[in-house]
Amino acid sequence: MIEVIYKEENPDIQEGEEGFCLPRNIRQIGVAGEKYKIYMEDYVYTFLIRLARTEENQEVQKGRVAVLTGEIKWKTGTAYLFIRGAVMAEDMEAAVDHLDFSVQVWKQIHEDQKKYFEDQEIVGWFFSQPRISMEATELLEKVHLKHFGGEKVLMLMEPQESEDAFFRY
């Protein structure tokens, strides 16, 4: 017997939402509020850890930035953020007291996104610096609201302790 289930027959799906199943190759990494769940593919997390640790052995430890790509889906009033890729912001001056998403940086990010993650949208950003506090500073919040508002997230990572945190404004 074959059972056919239509979108209209599912009482859990609200208007404007589409039904979906959670993928198996992805794990929940964070929650940014009761109605906002964050999932990230393992290879993306591994890439971000390696990116964060590239400066550990340098005398001058600058910050590392990447833009997160993926998609946001809604189910029963809850947002599910799926992070499926990350684009490193190369040649960007990044420190906890100075971040500059210049026109040139955005151009490079969009080119890489189109090349590697064409079917995905920007869903947030990543910032890492050794000995960074796991709290969003006023500068990080300003940068987030200017470039990544709405449903997008900020992921902070401290590479030496392997701590991370998510923020949404």
Give the positions of each predicted feature.
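N-terminal beta-strand/alpha-helix entry module and adjacent surface
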Residues: M1-G124, P130-Y169
